[in-house]
Amino acid sequence: MSLSNKLTLDKLDVKGKRVVMRVDFNVPMKNNQITNNQRIKAAVPSIKFCLDNGAKSVVLMSHLGRPDGVPMPDKYSLEPVAVELKSLLGKDVLFLKDCVGPEVEKACANPAAGSVILLENLRFHVEEEGKGKDASGNKVKAEPAKIEAFRASLSKLGDVYVNDAFGTAHRAHSSMVGVNLPQKAGGFLMKKELNYFAKALESPERPFLAILGGAKVADKIQLINNMLDKVNEMIIGGGMAFTFLKVLNNMEIGTSLFDEEGAKIVKDLMSKAEKNGVKITLPVDFVTADKFDENAKTGQATVASGIPAGWMGLDCGPESSKKYAEAVTRAKQIVWNGPVGVFEWEAFAQGTKALMDEVVKATSRGCITIIGGGDTATCCAKWNTEDKVSHVSTGGGASLELLEGKVLPGVDALSNI
């Protein structure tokens, strides 16, 4: 989708206005303590811009976890986020115990100039997602009239709307698409994400390499299919490589992942690659394990030797890493989505680590390197490479859907310019 024609915060006049801003404060928590504040830090530039440019108030709304429309303040309250945000901004943050209704509307109607207000978890109301569960765990759907009322209440909390929650941009939830204000702008985090992906997908530097890992082919079919129209080269690694190798080389894969559904379209994908002149690199050797366990016995295998019965491939081997490194060396732009081994376990992390080192090297020579969120972003955090690549996406699902060529509802809902 073209992202260049949407209103962004830098073009929005906020002076004297109440800004209602959707952010992504869905942070990991342990015993009500925030374990990683990256998402809160990522929203600070947009909040500060509004305050520095004379906004009357900034009202922040977010979800946290999956309470499914049931208020669970003990488990999923955003109150700890207000404390963290106060220390990051160096100013008071007023926390409200709900996100809609007369009391919230009153608190946000005429606040002191320069106020920052954080609302309670949007997903304590089933009207945010449109569906959820009741207190006994039965599935429930929100009533259309109540969804309308929920959206109308959110719309009363500001004069202008800013969406900086890229991580939720693929969800057509009330706070993402249902706030009815004349001006709806993308915040700076949203803008950074969309700019990177727009550049990557609409006018890429070439040669353009996609590195696609992860487990199931079926989950990545749309991704592979869409990227085959855009890239010059593609590495297909991780668990899904075994489905390709079994179909194409009749390789013995032991008990490695095999995706019956995905297997049916491997040949179609390969013929599309050939038609488009895309060079595909698959792994040629593997680190194997006698069971899916961190402390499993390990072995080696190649495509030619096959993987023995009862064993499975959990990482690529050194020859594969060499081939991957050659592809990285040729590239001027790289998009990476999905690890190439079970990186969480030391014995099977080497392939992904070696590839990360190559991608970092490529970045330092001027290659544009984009890490699609999720597991690959976790790899960056694990090996401390977040500032050694061009861009690490904050949205796993959202970045995946952009790379699949889908329209993101949260972006679509912003004002056109």
UniProtKB/Swiss-Prot annotation:
Coiled coil: none annotated. Its EC number is 2.7.11.1, 2.7.2.3. The modification N6-malonyllysine is found at K131. The modification N6-acetyllysine is found at K11, K48, K75, K86, K91, K97, K131, K146, K199, K267, K291, K361. Pfam families: PGK. Belongs to the phosphoglycerate kinase family. This is Phosphoglycerate kinase 1.
